[in-house]
Amino acid sequence: DCPWDWSSHEGHCYKVFKLRKTWEDAEKFCTEQARGGHLISLKSTEEVDFMIKLAYPILKANLVWIGLRDFWRDCHMGWRDHANLLYKAWSDEPNCFVAKTTDNQWFRRKCNISQYFVCQSRVPR
């Protein structure tokens, strides 16, 4: 079973934190709250719906950190004229992502901004 103040869904435990932290600090905080804890990973529409039902009553219309980071750096990119992508000028600021507490939209945010967040861990055995 999940800890008493966490919610259970599909083999995972979840908790909304009404604390504002940077992405790094929120991820670290989640690892300290529960064994195997991390920022929430949203892998299905059902999981997003569950997160919204959990987070909206606490945070109202807001944004929460999710466990997705550096997505664009992992994409295969190329120039329209098929030239090799040899010169790169990415900013040093990694891209982190937030989810809305009202629908299934995600947005990029600078990782050093403080946001609310949702932690997730596996149900303890």
Curated annotation (Swiss-Prot):
Expressed by the venom gland. It is found in: Secreted. Pfam families: Lectin_C. Coiled coil: none annotated. Keywords: Disulfide bond, Glycoprotein, Hemostasis impairing toxin, Secreted, Toxin. Heterodimer; disulfide-linked. Interferes with one step of hemostasis (modulation of platelet aggregation, or coagulation cascade, for example). Shows greater sequence similarity to the beta than alpha subunits compared to other heterodimer snaclecs. This is Snaclec B7. It comes from Macrovipera lebetinus (Levantine viper).
